[in-house]
Design a protein with these regions (language model features):
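Active-site lining segments that contact anionic ligands and/or coordinate catalytic metals
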Residues: 270-271, 305-307, 321-323, 327-329, ...
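Hydrophobic alpha-helix feature that most strongly marks membrane-spanning transmembrane helices
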Residues: 216, 245, 249, 279, ...
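Conserved Class I SAM-dependent methyltransferase catalytic core
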Residues: 14, 21, 31, 35-43, ...
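Non-catalytic, mostly N-terminal accessory regions of nucleic-acid modification and defense proteins
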Residues: 1-193, 252-260, 265, 358-361, ...
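Hydrophobic alpha-helical scaffolding
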Residues: 124, 146, 201, 229-233, ...
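Short, contiguous acidic/charged loop-to-helix segments that flank catalytic cores in large enzymes
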Residues: 25, 285-305, 331-340, 360-365, ...
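C-terminal, active-site-flanking charged/polar segments
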Residues: 352-353, 363-366, 370-415
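Conserved S-adenosyl-L-methionine
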Residues: 171-276, 281-297, 328-331, 339-353, ...
Length: 501
């Protein structure tokens, strides 16, 4: 049986249910910060306490030695910030002050978190009785299953944003990239030791978490990766800093949040790998003030859509052998409006597009438009060729609204790319095809995978039409007869209790 990704949202739903206790007791603008701060504190305290108890059992007296924790990438938590201290104060009037002090202690312990953690728990707007109830709920949660490999903060926050959007009647933002998409990008790009990884719109930092995990899984050194990110939203930037702190990843997100187009915090960076999920079809991004920008090598992107601004920004930041994996709305594959078709043509003719993967719908919690993975390379192994994959039928339904990839799905996509790069891939009707530049030119430089992979071959139906219709008609007649029998039985039962129909 195919191994499924950690797609179920049971833990996130527990968090959301706990958060709902606070609904109506705190201003909406502060709501998310309060919950995320509690998640962060509960998470790092749980990891710390497990190690602390191990050291106590060993009896060597090292349980307060910071190096014992830092050596295993476990966050050292000062006594006043430990969850046991918070839990003990849950039903006292001072619970807000205790939480604020815990956050200050954590920031003092880790300078990179200065002014990052929320410290609004003592606010008079927050009902302390209700806050204590939420602390109790967090205390009683089983955190044993939240190992480092899960992008807990990002998944939980993204889930909560979708819920907020549903309640408020507005669209949830593209805050977080689902783990199956991140894993697919990383599995195809294969980041290596001593590499520089960059995300110009990093959200909660999930791309970096998965890159580190990939390197570890392939016997690499997690400390050898250099992480660079930028985020324009202040709360999201803080979220990313917290996410990296939890996992012991040393990241450069700049000294503050900033707009990537107007204030490039890593202007001189040339990255080995760039992974990103930029905001889809962003309009009014400030093109009029960036007309002659050095990044627009393949023509200036239009004011009404930033898709090709993101692509060119990333190409600009690539090292000579660098690679990009990014998520874009499907419109970028075929649009001809406002000069976008010309930009796409120029990028294709520069032989930068290595592969395009059409993804299934419903992979995101809160975004329903179809999306595509783009893979761009400065030094392609297969010169003058591009791989097209139609993965729209892959994956499985987690529930009625959400789809995910299995690990086997992700491996199949990665293996297909590797075979293409090695020159051993054979086209598979309806799934994958390799096209040269001349073929793409004949398609007017449109990159929609369906134009190249064709339609999946169907097994020939050997049953003659007349025989099939006779069989199906007979089966339908039997079903109708059974339906009439059931209807008569139901009428009889209802009549027996005085309800004639």
């Amino acid at each position: 049986m195919a191994e499924k990704n950690n797609a179920n949202i049971g833990f996130e739903k527990q968090i959301w249910d706990a958060a709902c206790v606070l609904w109506g007791h705190i201003p909406a603008a502060e709501y998310r910060k309060v919950i995320i701060g509690l998640i962060f504190l509960r998470y790092i305290s749980s990891a710390f306490e497990r190690k602390y108890n191990e050291l106590v059992t060993e009896g060597e007296g090292f349980e307060e030695d910071r190096d014992e924790y830092l050596g295993e990438n476990i966050f050292f938590v000062p006594e006043k910030a430990r969850w046991s201290t918070v839990a003990a104060a849950a039903h006292t009037p001072e619970i807000g002050t205790v939480l604020d002090e815990a956050m200050r202690e954590i920031e003092a312990e880790n300078k990179s978190l200065k002014n990052v953690l929320p410290k609004n728990y003592a606010s008079p707007d927050l009902d302390k009785r209700v806050l204590g109830d939420v602390v109790d709920l967090f205390t009683n949660m089983d955190m044993s299953d939240t190992e480092e490999g899960k992008d807990l903060l990002g998944r939980t926050y993204e889930y909560c944003i979708a819920q907020f959007a549903a309640y408020e009647g507005v669209k949830g933002g593209e805050f977080y990239t689902p783990s199956s998409i991140v894993k697919t990008i990383v599995a195809i790009l294969k980041p290596f030791n001593n590499c520089r990884v960059y995300d110009p719109c990093c959200g909660s930092g999930g791309m970096f978490v998965q890159s580190v995990k990939f390197i570890q899984a392939h016997s690499g050194n997690r400390q050898s990766i250099s992480v660079y990110g930028q985020e324009s939203n202040a709360d999201t930037w803080k979220m990313a800093k917290m996410n990296m702190a939890i996992r012991g990843i040393d990241a450069d997100f700049g000294p503050y949040q900033a707009d990537t187009f107007f204030n490039d915090l890593h202007a001189n960076l040339r990255a080995d790998f760039i992974m990103a999920n930029p905001p889809f079809n962003l309009s009014n991004w400030g093109q009029d003030k960036l007309q002659d920008d050095v990044r627009w090598k393949y023509e200036t992107p239009p004011a009404g859509n930033a898709n090709y601004a993101w692509i060119q920004h990333m190409i600009h930041h690539l090292a000579p052998n660098g690679k990009i994996g990014l998520v874009l709305a499907n419109g970028a594959l075929s649009t001809q409006s406002s000069g976008e078709g010309e930009i796409r043509k120029n990028i294709i003719n520069a032989d930068l597009v290595e592969g395009i993967v059409a993804l299934p719908t419903q992979l995101f919690y809160s975004v329903t438009i179809p999306v595509t993975l783009w893979f761009i390379s400065k030094n392609k192994k297969q010169k003058g060729k591009t791989l097209f994959i139609d993965a729209r039928k892959m994956g499985y339904m987690v529930d009625r609204k959400h789809r995910d990839f299995t690990d086997e799905d992700i491996q199949k996509l990665a293996d297909t790319f590797e075979a293409f790069q090695n020159g051993t891939l054979e086209d598979v009707k309806g799934f994958c095809a390799v096209a040269d530049l001349q073929t793409i030119e004949k398609q007017d430089y449109i990159l929609t995978p369906g134009r190249y992979v064709g339609i999946e071959e169907q097994e020939e139906d050997s049953e003659p039409f007349d025989e099939k219709m006779a069989r199906l008609t007979s089966e339908l007649s039997d079903m109708f007869a059974k339906s009439h029998e059931l209807e008569a039985e139901i009428r009889k039962k209802l009549g027996a209790i005085g309800y004639e129909i």
